[in-house]
Amino acid sequence: MNLAPTRRAGALALSLTYVSEKVSVNLSGPAKTMLSTLYLKALDADFDRPILGDLFAKEAIDKLDFDWRELEITPKWAPLFTVRTAQYDIWVREFLAAHPECTVVHLGCGLDCRVFRIDPGADVRWYDVDFPQVIALREKIYPNRPNYQLIATPATEPGWLDQIPADRPTLLIAEGISMYLTEDDGIALLQRFIDRFGIGEV
């Protein structure tokens, strides 16, 4: 099964190779788990028939000063994770097709390259949200792009949603974050999202 889309000319023009020196990695706890998911996506990109085909992830791991052997991950594990990510990408594209002028909020973005894989149009506002140390690392290895903003905060902190205008349909992506939330925190987060945005999807 190959769910990887063909990269458009605009996406091909984007390169992460502007980083001249490797970036050190100092992460712990839940934030460190994002290294495994990034590496699995990079391994998938090397397959003859990739599921995700995330060449941005492959470029990103080359920018990090990290011994990937520490993860003890083999390529056979990659499909277990990339199938889920590819399905989320499909849902995002469907939402963007239905709402060309919209907002996307990606909770617990980690080092995921979704905004680059999707390459949303000029009328889409995209927010990637994660712990401050994660956002600091993203800023070092990924380029900026129009209508793209990073928010450095734990998802459970109240108030950060106020930074996001509520004037258009909004999609909340929460791939891989629910296991780190208590039931009360998860319910409270969803309620704040519902109260803030009148039209959207989770």
Give residue spans per PLM region.
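A conserved beta-strand element that flanks and buttresses the S-adenosyl-L-methionine
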Residues: 172-173
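Hydrophobic adenine-recognition pocket in adenosine-nucleotide-binding enzymes
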Residues: 177
